[in-house]
């Protein structure tokens, strides 16, 4: 595992007394430990090669806060709310199932690597990342063909475009990718806007799933009002915690897929809690992404076995593993500052919602 230069003097422990003294909101008052982690990825993903975040410890155990660095304060504040929900203790939720079907995530890798990933996972559903770039379309199609071959005819293939296509490109690409995949279960966020998703959904036979149009939108219900999606992708952290995600699922009224955001096992457990608590779950969930991290913070790591995550999965944080992934002083200082900014943004958001 490559070690960043920052790890040579790794500390990772945020000074709690200093954090409390600077937190004018009181949101972090019951947090008794905050540890910044920094982990390499096994393969580049979304243009990054490392993932970092902070684990918060409180009366309820560990919670994770890990918004990507290109997210602004408003988009990142719900991630703190989610981490605090975990660390301060969730109220008990119903459990409707003992296992969760989980997809294997296939990054933008070559066809052979894609095939190997699918076969090794044992999953019956594959989520394949595709590029927004026209010069990479042939590689996308080859990857999809390889995934279908590895899954066999009975498996399900879905693609994730992260809103990279305009409407015309989506109309052109989706039929090609549907054919290469031997039939797509759905296309996740092929276009960025709800208007384009709605137009595309009327123009093609491939079901449409909404991700960014839910978690980054000021009005997520617009996808329902405009009939822009067949499936809702729910990510706990960007929605502000399990309870808010459950509420969103109910308000949307669409079949839901619970997904993660390159989380450690601590973050995955928040997603698993949501998936176990949804009254209906008809699609495989995207909760197998710890495989994309070169290391983890829990032992055992929360990973699906043959495409299934069990109810008894847990995320016991290992001090030994935590010591191996603690961030260096530079990143630790940045996360302490960011936590305080997030607390301010979350406090302001809650004040607005209370009016």
Per-range role (PLM):
Residues 2-180, 298-355:
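N-terminal capping/lid subdomain adjacent to the active-site entrance of alpha/beta enzymes
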Residues 126-136, 156-163, 182-194, 206-216, ...:
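Catalytic beta/alpha-barrel core
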Residues 37-39, 105, 211, 259, ...:
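Conserved beta-strand termini and adjacent loop/short-helix elements that scaffold enzyme active sites
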Residues 121-124, 151-153, 175-184, 201-209, ...:
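Glycine-enriched alpha-helix->loop->beta-strand junction motifs that scaffold or abut catalytic
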Residues 40-42, 108, 214, 262, ...:
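Short, solvent-exposed coil/turn elements at secondary-structure transition points
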Residues 133-147, 165-169, 190-201, 217-219, ...:
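Active-site-adjacent beta->alpha loops and helix N-cap segments on the catalytic face
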Residues 219-221, 225-321:
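Shared catalytic-loop signature of beta/alpha-barrel
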């Amino acid at each position: 595992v490559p070690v960043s230069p920052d790890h040579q003097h790794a500390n990772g422990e945020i000074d709690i007394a200093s954090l409390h003294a600077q937190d004018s909101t009181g949101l972090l008052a019951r947090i008794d430990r905050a540890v910044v982690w920094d982990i390499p990825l096994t393969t580049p993903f979304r243009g990054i090669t490392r993932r970092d975040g902070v684990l918060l410890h409180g009366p309820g155990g560990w919670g994770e806060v890990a918004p990507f660095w290109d997210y602004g304060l408003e988009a990142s504040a719900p991630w703190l709310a989610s981490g605090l929900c975990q660390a301060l203790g969730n109220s008990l939720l119903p459990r409707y199932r003992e296992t969760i079907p989980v997809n294997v995530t296939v990054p933008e890798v070559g066809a052979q690597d894609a095939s190997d990933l699918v076969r090794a996972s044992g999953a019956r559903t594959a989520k394949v990342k595709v590029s927004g770039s026209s010069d990479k379309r042939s590689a996308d199609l080859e990857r999809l063909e390889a995934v279908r071959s590895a899954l066999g005819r009975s498996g399900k293939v879905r693609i994730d475009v992260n809103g990279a296509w305009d409407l015309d490109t989506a109309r052109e690409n989706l039929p090609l990718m549907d054919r290469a995949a031997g039939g797509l279960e759905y296309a996740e966020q092929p276009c960025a806007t709800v208007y384009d998703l709605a137009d595309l959904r009327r123009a093609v036979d491939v079901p449409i799933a909404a991700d960014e149009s839910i978690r980054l939108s000021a009005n997520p219900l617009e996808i329902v009002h405009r009939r822009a999606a067949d499936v809702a992708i729910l990510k706990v952290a960007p929605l502000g915690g399990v309870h808010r995600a459950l509420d969103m699922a109910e308000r949307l009224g669409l079949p839901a897929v619970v997904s993660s955001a390159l989380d450690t096992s601590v973050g995955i457990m928040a997603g698993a809690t949501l998936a176990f608590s949804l009254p209906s779950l008809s699609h495989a969930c995207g909760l197998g992404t710890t495989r994309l991290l070169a290391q983890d913070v829990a032992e055992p790591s929360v990973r699906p076995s043959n495409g299934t995550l069990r109810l008894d999965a847990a995320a016991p944080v290992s001090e030994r593993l935590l010591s191996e992934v603690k961030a260096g002083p530079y990143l630790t200082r940045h996360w302490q500052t960011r936590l305080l900014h997030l607390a301010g943004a979350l406090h302001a958001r809650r004040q607005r919602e209370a009016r």
